Regions:
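Short amphipathic alpha-helix that is part of the acyltransferase structural core
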Residues: 26-71, 75, 81-101
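Acyl-donor binding region in acyl/amide transferases
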Residues: 64, 104-268
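Short, well-structured beta-strand/strand-turn elements
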Residues: 60, 67, 267-277
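Conserved N-terminal entry element of GNAT/NAT acetyltransferase domains
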Residues: 2-40
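C-terminal/domain-terminus segments
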Residues: 270-308
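Short, flexible loop/turn elements at secondary-structure junctions
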Residues: 38-41, 87-89, 98-103, 140-142, ...
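Short, cationic low-complexity segments
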Residues: 307-331
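A short helix-loop-beta-strand connector motif used in the catalytic cores of GNAT acetyltransferases and
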Residues: 74-84, 107, 269-270, 280-286
Length: 331
């Protein structure tokens, strides 16, 4: 039985907690503001995040079923930080992520990280030694319901773009970060055959051959792999993508926006397989890893370089974004 979602938090309370010292940057589009907050310094903002997350995830077919989507990872001394986009004209949250730096990951008695994804994925020794110290885990990405329909809200089209601005700034602020680790989510309401085509396509073009991270209970496709192989016959990513887009549209669906966004971010993205998140509406979570210095140039310029132009003092000599900057200077 789903609980009734809490009422909106008073906007004056939210504004009182969104102080200048917590502001990360302005967005490239729409003149929105990006903040980093925690449960300790912004308890009312966190409640509003939990409310908006639960609304957005329920609408898509997931969610916790609780009055707000907050868990143990949102609280405590080693909690995830919350990155949010704030619309200063409407005084409301547009969307957000939560994140935790690899250097702050705690390990359990088996040597596995205590993360929001730990119940679904096993991390190899190689990942823990060679990747974890330079990785930031991203999770619970959401766009508030009011900003998901571009037909009714002209700023909706920039909601995801605004979130990427925040992630771009993180690579500059945290010099050790070289990788984004996170999940792509597919919901049970999405047609099975379309889901299978998307996951097959992703595995074909982005599969991790090193088994750096593996799902504990890998999701099995309903569609025979031979049928899918007969559909995706191209070696080229773009050619196969055109096939995917066409076939999914035939089913009356679109490729989910976040899946599209991740695929278009880096040609060397690593895919770690898919597991079912039984505590979150049985959504299907696909683990991914993106190397920051291999993000496509258009995305780098928009989301990383734009922050450095505004805040050159933030770029540290060891920053994971340095490879991006100096690579472009050499061209």
């Amino acid at each position: 039985m789903e609980e009734e979602i809490i009422q909106p938090i008073d906007r004056e309370l939210l504004k009182s907690e969104l102080t200048p010292d917590k502001q990360l940057r302005m967005t490239n589009k729409s003149h929105n503001e990006i903040y980093i907050v925690t449960a300790k310094d912004s308890p009312n903002v966190l409640k509003e995040i939990g409310r908006l997350r639960e609304i957005a995830f329920r609408e898509a077919g997931g969610g916790t079923g609780k009055s707000m989507d907050l868990d143990e990872f949102d609280f405590g001394d080693n909690c995830y930080k919350q990155l949010i986009v704030w619309n200063p004209e409407a005084d409301e949250i547009i969307g957000g992520y939560r994140y935790l730096l690899g250097k702050d990951w705690l390990l359990d008695e088996k040597g596995q990280p205590k993360l929001a994804t730990s119940h679904m994925f096993h991390f190899s020794d190689k990942f823990l030694k060679e990747y974890m110290p330079y990785t930031v885990e991203l999770g619970r990405s959401f766009v508030s319901l009011e900003y998901q329909n571009v037909r009714t809200n002209t700023k909706s089209i920039f909601a995801l773009d605004n979130l990427w601005d925040g992630l771009g700034a993180l690579t500059v602020l945290y010099p050790e970060v070289k990788y984004f680790f996170g999940k792509m989510t597919m919901y049970p309401s999405y047609i099975r055959r379309g889901r299978d085509m998307i996951l097959y396509f992703l595995k074909k073009h982005f599969d991790d051959k090193e088994n750096l991270v593996i799902p504990m209970k890998p999701l099995k496709l309903d569609t025979p792999e031979s049928d899918l192989a007969a559909i995706f016959t191209e070696d080229d990513f773009k050619a196969d993508y055109r096939i995917l887009n066409r076939e999914v549209r035939k089913l009356g669906y679109n490729i989910p926006p976040l899946v599209n966004a991740y695929m278009s971010l880096s040609p060397t993205m690593k895919l770690f397989g898919t597991a079912i998140n039984y505590g979150f509406g049985d959504v299907e979570e696909t683990g991914i890893l993106i190397a920051i210095d291999e993000i496509l140039e258009e995305k780098r310029v928009r989301h990383i370089n734009s922050f450095i132009d505004e805040h050159p003092e933030a770029l540290k000599i060891t920053s994971g974004a340095n490879n991006v900057i100096y690579k472009e200077k050499d061209i």
